[in-house]
């Protein structure tokens, strides 16, 4: 565990991670797992970033709400996040939807996923609640956001990104005054309001909220009693507080964690196949925008004990090699050539195969003479010998999930349907 000094505010906070969503825009990649459980970066899962931020910030009480196809997520959390100790006033609770308030009601929204577990949260008596989305890639020290929340006297503090106005139409957007107090909260506006003094940019919600716990519990109980509510933070809880209380925006630039190699605040919603592929492939750059090698802010995860990667054969046309690539443990590159690709644990790439701009999830087997470019290959897929992907857009679209930008998602069920 990191030796980072635990700050007083973080010690009195509980992080609550919302990890129940499917992430339907990832298509078949989330057929068997929730979006927060999707693999990322060669070793981790998406949820590990929010959890690592909480841990590295000094927060030692964490709850994770799960719902959609949660088995792989729960298994990952049990294996990788079981080091919290009650005798040190630490806790880590996995909170699957379990009809705690009604025999017919699962989690009906993001706010409801917290409300249904009030009886678990309140005995811990945290002074502050940090509500987090479990499906974004970023590094952030929540201690700074907690400090702003206390200093401002806000009822809620909302983490925000500064984005170009015309790129903010897909977000919940904060209309703020000169003190970053939120005047209005607008969900996916056609004409987003600009930031005072910087009108070309807007403040977009990151789905991160800080509350005093007592205030949040009262707000959740009031919302649960409203039959017209959709039980959602963004649609119900936050707009109510903006209208009747005090809401303040916290700018991500003020708390993002950057190493010496990271020049701009890094935050990604990897909710589409294109965005997921791009964020992984970006890690193969000489100096990537996201530094996952920063030892001062480690990304904690469950890591199997595996042998190291191995590259074999050195013939002219059969050389095990990798250029500008990330290759994880237990991979064997047997006479295959990789270029600008990212391989997770346990991949086997056999002789004469070629991979370029490929994101390959764990335990994939690449047959001889396969030629694959601009692909995401799902866990455990067996690529047949001689398969070519990335050269014929029309054929690729018939066989696989091909995006408009030309990225192909390949799953085992798609391979099984091929007429080879």
From Swiss-Prot:
The keyword tRNA processing does not apply. Keywords: ATP-binding, Carbohydrate metabolism, Glycogen biosynthesis, Glycogen metabolism, Nucleotide-binding, Nucleotidyltransferase, Transferase. It catalyses: alpha-D-glucose 1-phosphate + ATP + H(+) = ADP-alpha-D-glucose + diphosphate. Alpha-D-glucose 1-phosphate binds at residues 107, 172, 187-188, 205. Gene3D superfamilies: Hexapeptide repeat proteins (2.160.10.10), Spore Coat Polysaccharide Biosynthesis Protein SpsA, Chain A (3.90.550.10). Disulfide bonds: none annotated. PROSITE patterns: ADP_GLC_PYROPHOSPH_1, ADP_GLC_PYROPHOSPH_2, ADP_GLC_PYROPHOSPH_3. Its EC number is 2.7.7.27. The keyword Membrane does not apply. GO terms for biological process: glycogen biosynthetic process. Transmembrane segments: none annotated. Pathway: Glycan biosynthesis; glycogen biosynthesis. InterPro entries: ADP-Glc_PPase, ADP_Glu_pyroP_CS, GlgC_bac, GlmU/GlgC-like_hexapep, NTP_transferase_dom, Nucleotide-diphossugar_trans, Trimer_LpxA-like_sf. GO terms for molecular function: ATP binding; glucose-1-phosphate adenylyltransferase activity. Homotetramer. This is Glucose-1-phosphate adenylyltransferase.
